[in-house]
Amino acid sequence: MLLDTLQTQFRHYFPTQRNFVLGLSGGIDSIVLLHLLAELQLNLRAVHIHHGLSPNADNWAAFCEQVCKRLKIPFILQKVTVDRSEGIEAGARAARYQAIGEIIQPNEVLVTAHHLDDQTETFLLALKRGSGIKGLSAMQAVGFWQNFTIFRPLLNVSKAQIEQYALQQQFTWIEDESNHDSHYDRNFLRNEVLPIVNQRWQHFSQMVARSAQHCAEQQMLLEELLAQELQRYADFSEKRLNIEAFPQFSLAKQQQLIRLWLEKCGAQMPSTAQLMQIIQQTIYADVDKNPQLKLADFWLRRYQHHLYLTGELLEPDDFCQPLFAQQSLTLPDGIGELQHLGDSIIYQKSGKIDRLLLPKALVNAPLQVKLTHQGKVKQYGKPMREEMKKRYQQAQVPVWLRKRTPLIFFHDQLVFICH
């Protein structure tokens, strides 16, 4: 019985968790799951995402609200705008999860009605894209999306079982007309390919799920084996990866370490072609080169023996402000905050705090803060002037951060580079 299956899944994965949000489309899968969850006496809310892609979208939202009202389950409606640049399916999925991320609470888990047949489709779509073992792992019963957890308790339940239960219970649900459009890849598999395959091999979906699980286990093992080395080379707080030793690694190891680092930094996974471009243009670049590559919403940049993952960095306007003892100064464009404590300077940025002790002669002295300096500069306490570029290099400030790094001056002498 489906209810028994569901209870077993909850006891196994979330024995103490009580707060859940159901992604409710109004289709047969999520309607069945809604009724099942209502019997478990959980702290449950349901969210319906209004994509605005169908003329029936308003009716679907109203239907979901009525069902939830009847079951006394709090209902949330979220309207989204779908970015179609990456395709309607991908755009709708991204908009859906972003909207859910806006309403889900830290103590809640998202529950979705993905089932065994969905798993087969996901696996075959990954196969079509040429995915490796991570992609071929398809979906897991418990997954993550940015800041929340996703639970798929019906992943081992077939569509036929769900349909049978819905008919037995005389549920009503909505039919999305786009599900019959085989122009979409997933629908093509569902409507044209899998019915023929299942006629030939009755347990095809179960075997695909088994293969996906094998891939997931291999991926977990790979991550476990590389965990220590990743920890050695990666600084996740700074989104930085030391690649000095990478040329002596095999290509496969280079690829996996870069993939794992990018994933843990929250970046979109590169394609195989992009990954090869990253390796060729960064790992094997001359040490004096500073290549940079666009990766979705991020930039991948190399400086000396490190890779850095950054967002789009805007160049701030010219900045020059005095900093007196016992005074604070907020820098523009999120660059941070400075405090002059008399005997030291505190530089605070993104939760990280550095304390720079002033020379005795400069205790309580008025200072000056700049974000850039051209030409030569005299370091405080040293007789010779030298190029500012050399001072940046000595302080290991990457090229793209040099106009976003505070410089502390006493008159025309450089006291600190705050990096």
Swiss-Prot record:
It is found in: Cytoplasm. It comes from Actinobacillus pleuropneumoniae serotype 5b (strain L20). One of its GO terms (biological process) is tRNA modification. HAMAP family: tRNA_Ile_lys_synt. The N-terminal region contains the highly conserved SGGXDS motif, predicted to be a P-loop motif involved in ATP binding. The gene is tilS. The keyword Repressor does not apply. GO terms for molecular function: ATP binding; tRNA(Ile)-lysidine synthase activity. ATP binds at residues 25-30. It comes from the Bacteria. Gene3D superfamilies: 1.20.59.20, HUPs. This is tRNA(Ile)-lysidine synthase.
